[in-house]
Swiss-Prot record:
Lineage: Bacteria, Bacillati, Bacillota, Clostridia, Eubacteriales
Keywords: Glycogen biosynthesis, Glycosyltransferase, Transferase
Protein's name according to its UniProt entry: Glycogen synthase
Organism: Clostridium botulinum (strain Alaska E43 / Type E3)
InterPro entries in the cross-refs: Glyco_trans_1, GS/SS, Starch_synth_cat_dom
Coiled coil region boundaries: none
Function: Synthesizes alpha-1,4-glucan chains using ADP-glucose.
Catalytic reactions on record: [(1->4)-alpha-D-glucosyl](n) + ADP-alpha-D-glucose = [(1->4)-alpha-D-glucosyl](n+1) + ADP + H(+)
Amino acid sequence: MRVLFVASEAHPFIKSGGLGDVAGALPKELARKGVDVRVVIPKYREINNELKNKLRFNKWFNVDVGWRNQYCGILEYEYDGVIYYFVDNEYYFSRGGMYGHYDDAERFAFFDRAVLDMIKQLDWKPNIIHCNDWQTGMIPVLLKLEYMRKDMFYWDIKSVFSIHNIAFQGVFDPVILPELFGYDYEQYTNTNLKFDDGVGFMKGAINYSDMITTVSYSYAEEIKTPEFGERLDWLLREKSYMLRGILNGIDYDEFNPKNDNLINKNYDVNNINDKYENKRNLQSELGLNVNENIPIIAMVTRLTSQKGLDLLVNISERLLQNDIQLVIVGTGDKHYEDHFKWLDYKYGNKVSANIRFDNNLAHKVYAASDMFLMPSLFEPCGLGQLIALRYGSIPIVRETGGLKDTIRAYNEYTGEGNGFSFYNYNADELLHIIEYALKIYYDKNKWSNLVKNAMNSNNSWSKSADEYLNMYKELSYR
């Protein structure tokens, strides 16, 4: 089984969010299961310098982008048993930032065609091309409309498209069809690519892929509804026979408190008390009162409305009347950043607002915190709650998407469950469930058992990789 995993980012080379984690961890797990899996991403300027210097040039060729004929270099590097390819073009990818440029349509039109040209240039034919999010959305379109019709090399390659966040669809002016792809407007007028008055990369992928996946069971159901479907819900209902939800996992090699070299004191489920040394160290480092008995409630997140920040802003002053400490790590919308900076200023030794993304600090926060907040408005899967479980920080989540699938509400009478949850997007419900969690926290026997439940939760990639592998096999036999 040969699989080409195509993404716009991949850890440890470069990442901006959960997609990068998936593209770094899932292929590694598939390789362990005997799959010949290779990953391809753009060669951005910001790729980790230490790794960038190890990339080996393979070959170059030209790629047609409408009337343009652009240079494409292919570099490669083997990491953790997986071959990574890097598509090189200085004009498109040697810039500040991966996304948000005026010509993103052209940049990823080039990338998508370069990927299809690359596999023939390298004479490596995958059974499956697994595409991820809108940046790779035109690959299934190009494959079906052009490459399979013109060249027998491509005729039996199947495509999978994974939706990591349906809110980002890649919609551009219809002029890109002739300008970037050399197509007429038929695909626009027949609505296969038409989204409002534009061309949608994601819509094209949904229409032309052989299978569609998303990152949790609940999110697969949610995006078929008007509330969550971002106006593609009707199409996903139509395609529901080929839509599957497969839960993300986390990389147990990277996120393991037993041997994590970014935290102060290693620990596991058999010596949970060592977690308190991490807590005291973090309190000291962040200027909080050093007291292991005060619960630390943490968020490591993008500071956006999707993450439920409106709810936390609403209750923050009431919440801080409790004997707690609040730690925030992340960047995002300025009004949220300013609010948490103000709380930090006002409450000093009770609040630490770290308005930056700092991976080292994030690991320390997971290891030191007692509770981890994710009151998201919507959450396709969520990785934060999975990492928190691994480190024995108890998730407090809203029941949506992957949060609903991975967090089982604690039952104080049976001792079952691995976190706390609430249903309605309501600030008072959030405050109520946090205060309930605080009540359980002060019952040390119950809390200790809850932490063990959390740390014993299995959220590795192994089970999910089996589901992907079964899907690949099913597709390749069609």
